[in-house]
Design a protein with these regions (language model features):
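Small beta-barrel nucleic-acid-binding modules, primarily SNase/OB-fold domains
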Residues: 1-168
């Protein structure tokens, strides 16, 4: 492969090169793993190629699976994180214990474990695409909204995080 990089590209100062982003992308995503109630990995088909991303849901924050060791009520916090993770999996129709099935974008969406519709916004501070998740394309209510209405997650606008109420 013949490839030519200019000095400006190699030095990283060429501002004319766009930063890759999924901002405004909409499409199906096949969930491959769920970390907690607001972070998951999924595969999307982009320009005919499967690509895996770590996504962060927009609009809410869930308790952390690994809170700091000195945290007060740490066990309760972990319990709340597991509840949020399990609810997210259920709302997305994802079962990580289900047998692996090959997936292609032409399969019936109701028969694929963890196939969801996503709408991407900008990236968060860690570079993860921020997404609104829908169980099916055309659903009126997003998974994000259902998580917020459940009360086990906090509304989050990307700024200061609220502490979690451990009333379960």
């Amino acid at each position: 492969m013949n490839c030519c990089f200019t000095k400006r590209i190699l030095s990283g100062v060429d501002d004319s090169i766009p930063v890759f982003s999924l901002n405004n992308y909409e499409g199906y995503a096949k969930i491959t793993s769920v970390y907690d109630g607001d972070t998951f990995k999924a595969v999307i088909i982009l320009h005919g190629r499967p690509l895996k991303f770590t996504f962060r849901t927009i609009g809410y924050d869930s308790a952390e699976m690994k809170p700091s060791l000195g945290m007060r009520a740490r066990a309760d916090h972990i319990h709340l994180a597991r509840l949020a993770r399990d609810m997210f999996k259920e709302e997305c129709g994802f079962d990580d214990r289900a047998p692996f099935r090959l997936w292609n974008p032409f399969m019936c969406r109701n028969k694929v474990n963890g196939l969801v519709w996503i709408e991407c916004g900008k990236n968060d501070k860690y570079g993860r695409p921020l997404v609104t998740v829908y169980r099916h394309k055309g659903d009126k209510q997003s998974v994000n909204q259902k998580m917020i209405e459940s009360g086990i997650v906090n509304v989050y606008d990307g700024k200061k995080k609220d502490s979690f109420s451990l009333k379960i």
